[in-house]
């Protein structure tokens, strides 16, 4: 191995170690687990897209826990980062696919929908949907060897996109902000 190859290998391992620890490098600084949204914004700048969801409600009190997804799109040469905050605390940094250039005015087609992988990509490429449905689903409990696993509710959304009169409506299903299904629907 040449010296350059060793250096690149070391750099790649360092980057992977940071990603696994839930850290995000912004310039010369790092933000990691437990960071406040204000600290992240001060260090990394404003996110490209933010979505917020209630994750727990109590009768008489209303929403008692929230989750925010912050997306940073550095362009086509780097990966999109999704930061997950629970109750105002950074709990996870996800590395998604390569970034992209965002058009000034979104132009959407069924092909664009089929290539989108996240809620951010849908918004950036197609704009807001005509309508949304949001619900929390609890996966069925399964016995894992000798004990029952605890389950976390999963945020499931359906986004309806309408196109010209000669195209079917498209319903995009997202689970935890990731596109999982797209189906065509005739006008009703």
Model region roles, listed by residue range:
Residues 20-188:
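Residues within mature, well-folded domains
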Residues 1-8:
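Bacterial N-terminal signal peptides that target proteins for export
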Residues 10-19:
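Hydrophobic h-region of N-terminal signal peptides that target proteins for export
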């Amino acid at each position: 191995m040449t010296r350059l190859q060793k250096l690149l290998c070391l750099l790649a391992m360092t980057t992977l170690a940071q990603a696994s620890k839930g850290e995000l490098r912004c310039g010369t600084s790092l933000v990691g687990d437990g960071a406040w949204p204000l600290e992240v914004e001060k260090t990394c700048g404003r996110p490209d897209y933010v979505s917020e969801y209630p994750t727990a409600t109590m009768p008489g009190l209303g929403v008692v826990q929230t989750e925010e997804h912050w997306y940073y799109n550095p362009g086509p040469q780097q990966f999109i980062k999704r930061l997950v905050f629970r109750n105002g605390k950074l709990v996870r940094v996800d590395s998604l696919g390569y970034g992209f250039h965002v058009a000034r005015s979104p132009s959407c087609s069924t092909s664009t929908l089929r290539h989108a992988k996240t809620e951010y990509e849908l918004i950036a490429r197609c704009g807001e949907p005509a309508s949304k449905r949001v619900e929390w689903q609890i996966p069925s409990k399964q016995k894992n060897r000798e004990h029952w696993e605890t389950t976390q509710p999963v945020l499931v959304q359906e986004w309806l996109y309408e196109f010209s009169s000669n195209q079917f409506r498209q319903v995009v299903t997202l689970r935890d902000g990731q596109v999982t299904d797209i189906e065509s629907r005739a006008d009703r």
